[in-house]
Curated annotation (Swiss-Prot):
Top EC class for this record: hydrolase
Keyword Calcium appears in the UniProt entry: no
Entry protein name: Kynureninase 2
GO cellular component assignments: cytoplasm
Cofactors: pyridoxal 5'-phosphate
Organism: Chaetomium globosum (strain ATCC 6205 / CBS 148.51 / DSM 1962 / NBRC 6347 / NRRL 1970)
Compositional bias per record (Gly residues), positions renumbered to this chain: 340-352
HAMAP family named among the record's database cross-references: Kynureninase (MF_01970)
Chain's role: Catalyzes the cleavage of L-kynurenine (L-Kyn) and L-3-hydroxykynurenine (L-3OHKyn) into anthranilic acid (AA) and 3-hydroxyanthranilic acid (3-OHAA), respectively.
Superkingdom, natural source: Eukaryota
GO molecular function list: kynureninase activity; pyridoxal phosphate binding
Pathway involvement of the protein, from the record: Amino-acid degradation; L-kynurenine degradation; L-alanine and anthranilate from L-kynurenine: step 1/1; Cofactor biosynthesis; NAD(+) biosynthesis; quinolinate from L-kynurenine: step 2/3
Family in the record: Belongs to the kynureninase family.
PTM-bearing positions, type N6-(pyridoxal phosphate)lysine: 316
Length: 539
């Protein structure tokens, strides 16, 4: 089975479909795959919500999956029902099928240790925690925490060095900060190219940035639509690379910024970031990527691809918790810092890395006046050597850290540092290997349901279709299922009642994401079993 497992991975990596045996539809086969999964032990490092904990209505001191008896405020055992009888439903202790890591990752158990270390540091040495860390602490001093997290992320995002990364704020705030620095419209180049169905927060950010510059989305925002998305049957919801490149060419002379998602949140489509970036930059367009669904999900080479900037969150595939700090990548060619700049007082010493002739101003003029690329500045973006000297003159910190504005939340950074350590130990290649097989197995079983006519309507219409691209190189860990009209509410309830957690997007889509760090092949089989039953009952 080891050989077969690896053969499946290699086949999928090559863009082909593996030939699963007929008995692959059984739970025994799914368990065989789990037995040969070299990453299976990672699951024990997470708190996976149980079927019982998902129904919890009040805090009781317990944590899903822990074997110790939870503490209950009124002293009644959690194994006792409200009427005083013992709850014999052992299924309450079973882990749920948690296929929603594309919305919020499961909780790593080690996060408590990191948060406790921060709280003890704060309680023990107070303000000195800004500059001091304990020898046996997993944390750096508070003012060095963001940089420590950046150092952990070099391989994760494919940066040249930690200088190209910083953790701060949350994703949309960081997107605004990056656009304030990199979207510098002129009378000739004022357009932003985006895709037709971005996450709403990105739409709000794009529109507000255009309005900030006195521009109108109707004339300055180009949305790339699928060719005839409503006229074909079934409608096309994804974008081909050639169509994206053609749109870039059509608007190249008037475009200032291209901003796309690495993975489209709704369809789960993974874009060819290397080719698109290269094509746009060759036409003088600044390229930014929203990597909310890509970091921790797929392999990235942001520096080698020449990406100007990128932003991402850490609460999805990175598992750092709801609202955790976001990440930012700024290519080294934008780090230039020339002594003698004027304007608002920026001075420096010619720092920068990976320069390719762009300098520090990106051609907008302001950078040469300031001595560095224009940005919205704040005290935490100042050079650490002078940060506490209370100077009025802004001296940017080296690299992406120079785009910081405010003191980051250390308790959030503790969570980020904890989970990044897990990615350091495992590596993205191993995670991606498992991910392509998990998703490939899920797709094969789903296609089996369609072939069997499960849930087919009276007019012969299928119960669902997979709107995520079929080629493994064109998707991450998510498969999006577009249900036949009228099925979503009933199917969603059946899934929830069966202990399955997925993301529901009205009117008709469920997003299914078996994340390789903590999801099993048995979970994939279990999802298919519950989904099959749901379609039978609701069709």
């Amino acid at each position: 089975m080891d050989t077969e497992y690896q053969s499946f991975v290699e086949t999928l990596r090559a863009g082909q479909k593996p030939e699963f045996p007929a008995h692959a539809k059984t739970i025994e086969y799914a368990r065989e795959l789990d037995a040969h999964d070299k990453l299976s032990q990672l699951r024990s490092d997470f708190n996976i919500p149980t079927k019982g904990s998902l129904r919890k209505k009040a805090l009781d001191g317990g944590v899903a999956g822990e074997t110790k008896e939870p503490r209950v405020p009124n002293g009644v055992s959690s194994a006792t029902k409200p009427n005083g009888t013992v709850n014999s439903d052992l299924k309450d202790d079973e882990a749920s099928i948690y296929f929603v890591g594309n919305s919020l990752g499961a909780q790593p158990k080690c996060i408590r240790q990191y948060i406790d270390a921060h709280l003890e540091t704060w309680a023990s040495i107070g303000v000195n925690g800004h500059f001091t860390s304990f020898d046996n602490s997993p944390l750096a001093s508070w003012q060095d925490m963001a940089a420590a997290c950046a150092a952990q992320s070099v391989d994760l995002v494919g940066a040249k060095s930690a200088n190209e990364i910083i953790y701060m704020n949350t994703l949309t705030v960081n997107l605004h900060l990056m656009m304030a620095s990199f979207y510098r419209p002129t009378a000739k180049r004022h357009k932003i190219i985006a895709e037709w169905k971005p996450f709403p927060s990105d739409s709000y950010a794009l529109a507000s940035q255009l309005h900030w510059h006195g521009l109108a989305p109707a004339t300055s925002l180009i949305e790339i639509h699928p060719p005839n998305p409503t006229g074909s049957s079934p409608p096309t919801l994804t974008l081909t690379t050639s169509h994206i490149l053609a749109t870039i060419d059509a608007h190249a002379d008037s475009t200032a910024l291209l901003l796309l998602p690495g993975i489209q949140y709704y369809t789960g489509q993974l874009f060819d970031m290397a080719r698109i970036t290269r094509h746009a930059r060759a036409r003088g367009i600044v390229v930014g990527w929203d990597l909310a669904h890509a970091v921790g999900n797929v392999e990235l080479e942001l520096h080698a691809w020449g990406v100007d900037f990128a932003v991402w969150c850490t609460y999805k595939y990175l598992n750092a918790g709801p609202g955790a700090l976001g990440g930012v990548f700024v290519h080294g060619r934008h780090h230039s810092f020339h002594r003698g700049g004027g304007g608002s007082g920026g001075v420096g010493g010619g720092r920068g890395e990976g320069g390719d002739g762009d300098g520090g101003d990106g051609g907008d003029g302001d950078g040469m006046a300031l001595g560095y690329r224009h940005r919205l500045a704040g005290w935490y973006g100042a050079d650490k050597a002078v940060r506490f000297e209370m100077e009025k003159v802004f001296w940017p910190a080296e690299g992406a850290a120079g785009w910081q504005v405010s003191n980051p939340s250390v308790v959030d950074l503790a969570c980020v540092r904890a989970t990044l350590g897990m990615f350091e130990r495992v590596g993205m290649r191993a995670l991606r290997d498992k991910a392509v097989l998990l998703t490939g197995y899920l797709e094969w079983l789903l296609l089996g349901l369609l072939a069997d006519g499960v849930g087919k309507g009276g007019d012969g219409e299928a119960a669902f279709r997979i709107i995520t691209p079929g080629h493994p190189a064109d998707r991450g860990s998510q498969l999006s299922l577009l249900l036949r009209g009228g099925l979503l509410e009933g199917v969603s309830k059946e899934l929830a009642d069966g202990g399955v957690v997925v993301d529901v997007r009205k009117p008709d889509v469920i997003r299914v994401a078996p994340v390789p760090m903590y999801c099993r092949f048995e979970d994939v089989w279990g999802f298919i079993t519950v989904f099959n039953r749901a379609l039978d009952r609701c069709a």
